[in-house]
Amino acid sequence: MLEAQLDWGLALAILVGFGILWVAFGWYLGRDNRSIDDYALAGRNVGFAFATATAMATWITSNTTLVAPQLAYQFGIWGMIGYSMAAFGLMLFAPMAQRIKSLMPHGFTSGDFIRTRYGKSAWAMFMIISVFYAMGWLVSLGMAGGILLSSLSDLSYHTGMSAILIICVLYTLLGGLKAVIATDFVQSILILTGVVIIAWVCIDTVGIGEIHQSVSDFQPELLNVAFPAAIMFLFNNIFFGIGEIFHSNVWWSRAFAFKTGVGKRAFLLGGLLWLPIPIVTGFIALAAISLGILPPSADMVGPLVAAKLLGSIGAVFVFVVVFSALASSMDSLLAATSDLITQDGYKRLINPKADSDTLLKASKRVVIGLGVLTWLLCLPKVATLGALLNFTGAFVASAIWPIVFGLYHQGLTGRFATAAMALGTITGLVLYFVIGFYVAAISACLMSLAVCLMGLLFAPGKFDWQTFKEPDNVPE
């Protein structure tokens, strides 16, 4: 165990204190939730400051705080720069958020859009992609909580994993999206402050020159700008990040929840604020060589370096910052996935006549169910965080072009949209296993684009945008 690690008593006290604080905050914010609109979309009245904070904080996930250092440790400079390219997803979604709000001012989920625009077959394929990705992301966040706690203290992986799941499920259950967005605002301030302080201490204590020399001596390939696997990862991650945001109900629910005119500015600024964070967290990981840290697993390198640099007090600080980052994503994902399952699953397939109160109760039950299922899937810890997240890249990247063409072009039909998502996913998964995780997303995206272009060229349709305004397609 490192000297900088926390003893189990202090770690447990922080965990309990943190949990009580967030759960109480969630209860306080959720007291006035009276309808499914209040619970799922925060009354569709979120302003610019909170909108920007939740966009940035939600994207600062286990990926940014644990996987970005892991990839810098494995791929060097292209690892951290490549991860920062995921900011393009947020920035490119900015004009799309405005388009979504104008087309579907009363929409609830991304599934609403796909079903109305392309029909039931495409909707079914899209739901498979969305639910699979959501579970992959939830499991990665649960695993990250366990990895964080076991890296910084004597507490086990299973204790940390269980704790973050229980805390996030409780305050999401009590407060809904309103609590999620408000806690994101606080968490974004903690995260930004923490990342800056840790980076400054790293530069002051170790020094850029010493870090460069150590990497040059012991792992020179990490500084090689022509490192083939790292270059492939760079381009793959751009499309992975875009696919994650374009398809996910986490971001669509925010487009619906933000005030009219806010979404475009909020997503653009959120992306710009997020852009440097993976570079900073990745840079910290390169100091592991100078500090003589050999992490038992590559995804533990970030917390171990930060704790070593900052000492015992720093370990507390690192714990709070990374835990905030994980919570800010898990609560958003729980809320958005429960909306998707409630609206597109329960209401559409099981109880079409469900009123607002019934949907509100169903949504809360789904949040609990998602928490339990995620806990069960996290128990074995079957992969590293990087491998788990990138496995879902084939799924999400295949949905990029059907969504873009669906929003801006009348010609793409449901048959070709379905084929694009299915063939794109299959191609990405095959190449994931044949070549590696760093080609899954880009290959899925290219195959999906080829199918979409074939549809536009050989069998174009003419979708009527007014279909979104018809009574059957406007949620009650």
Task: Specify the residue positions occupied by each region the protein language model found.
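Membrane-embedded helix-loop-helix hairpins and adjacent transmembrane boundary segments
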Residues: M1-E476
